[in-house]
Structures are given as structure tokens and as C-alpha cells.
Amino acid sequence: MSDLLSALLLGILEGLTEFLPISSTGHLLIAQHWLGARSDFFNIVIQAGAIVAVVLVFRQRLLQLATGFGQRENREYVFKLGAAFLVTAVVGLVVRKAGWSLPETVSPVAWALIIGGIWMLLVEAYTARLPDRDQVTWTVAIGVGLAQVVAGVFPGTSRSASAIFLAMLLGLSRRAAAAEFVFLVGIPTMFAASAYTFLEMAKAGQLGSENWTEVGVAFLAAAVTGFVVVKWLMGYIKSHKFTAFALYRIALGAALLLWLPSGS
């Protein structure tokens, strides 16, 4: 398989999995066992490509928040987005400076998929007994920020799954409202992560080793695919639970543990 085709497939995979609660990083780590390992910069860039999709899907909401910033409700929502981002940025930077790196084996990803799937089922069962609430509290905002860090530390957890379900558990029980807040927080989070990694690699003189054609193709593939997925998901969760995704995670994690040799 050519490197360009491999990059295209990884971009499509990122777009498909970044916003579904099934872990994009986990799927990319698994896929790279067969499609070839890529740099951290490549992975961050295609994640940023997927975030472009969020900007396009929620462009009207973003415009509303910007033009209506003088209104208390919009202003508080923006401040809570900022708080969630700052928590992720500060705690994430501490974790990064501590030298934490992603595991190179699939087994931890498999376990994270299984545990995350069970967590999703439990939260769905609990919140089903609660009235629908769409108010983002400060507790929800801080929780979402911390959940994003956890997802970054443990691939297979899923940023969207950990953040959306913690938001639901903390009181933002309406799925669409929780997903919207998490996706909007993802915009500055992933763009900041991309910029940080870019500057680090530039200082180290490592950018010359990247194939920019492959990076560009993967970025566009992730953006286009992500746009379609986000539009579909926001409609789907208005009338469906996340149960199907939870069962998929458990099945995939179990299959990986059964089929992959130990140490993989």
C-alpha cells in the first residue's frame, strides 16, 4: 500500500472516529499496526482537520455566541467554554512536561475500550431516570476539561465519550446539549494542541521529515469525513441513546484481547 493511500485512509478513519464515542486515537493506534506508524505531528494535524468540521457544522452557533456576547446567557456559555479549555490546557501541559507518552501496544487500548463501553452503559442507565437538562454549569465545564486530559493520557478512552458522559453524569443530561458543549470545547483544545506540537517540532528541526502532501491529504479527508459524521451524530442522538457505540467498544476491545498476541 502506498504511503499516500495510507495517509488518506488514516484521515478518513480520524474523521469517522474523532466525534463518535469510540476513540479516534485508539483506532489510529490500532490501524497504524497495519498501515504504518505516523508521527505525533501527523496525528495531531488530522485531529485538527476533524475539528475544522466542527467549526463548519456549528458555524451558526459560533456566530450567535460572538454577535450575542453582550447577552448574559451567551457570555456565560463562552466563559464556561474558556474554563473547560483552560483546565485541559494547564493540566495537559503538566502531564506532558512530566514525560507521559502514549502506549505503543494495543492491549491498553483494548482495555480502555471495554471499560469505557461499560462506563457509557452505566451512565446511560443512570441519566435515563433524570429529567432532561441542558444548562451547562461550572461543574460541568471543569469536569469536561479534566475528562479531555484523561482521554489524552489513556488512548482508547475517547475524548468525546469521557467528556460527554461526565457532563451527563454531572447534570447536563440532554445528550445533544452535552455533545454540543464538548464539540465546541474541542475547537480551541485541538487547535492549541496542533500549534503546540508544531512549535515543538519546529524548534527540534523535525518538520522537514514530514511529507506535506500526505499530511494535507489526510487533513482534508479528516475534515470532510468529520463534517458528515458530526451532522449525522447530532441528529441521531436526539432520538437515540449511545448504547450501540458502547456495545461496539466492548466487542472491539474483547476481540483485540482475544486475537492479538500477548505484548501487542
Swiss-Prot record:
EC number: 3.6.1.27
A biological process term (GO) from this entry: regulation of cell shape
Organism from which the protein derives: Stenotrophomonas maltophilia (strain R551-3)
Keywords associated with the record: Antibiotic resistance, Cell inner membrane, Cell membrane, Cell shape, Cell wall biogenesis/degradation, Hydrolase, Membrane, Peptidoglycan synthesis, Transmembrane, Transmembrane helix
Entry GO terms, CC: plasma membrane
Family according to the record: Belongs to the UppP family.
Lineage: Bacteria, Pseudomonadati, Pseudomonadota, Gammaproteobacteria, Lysobacterales
Name listed for the protein in its UniProt record: Undecaprenyl-diphosphatase
Gene designation per UniProt: uppP
Pfam families: BacA (PF02673)
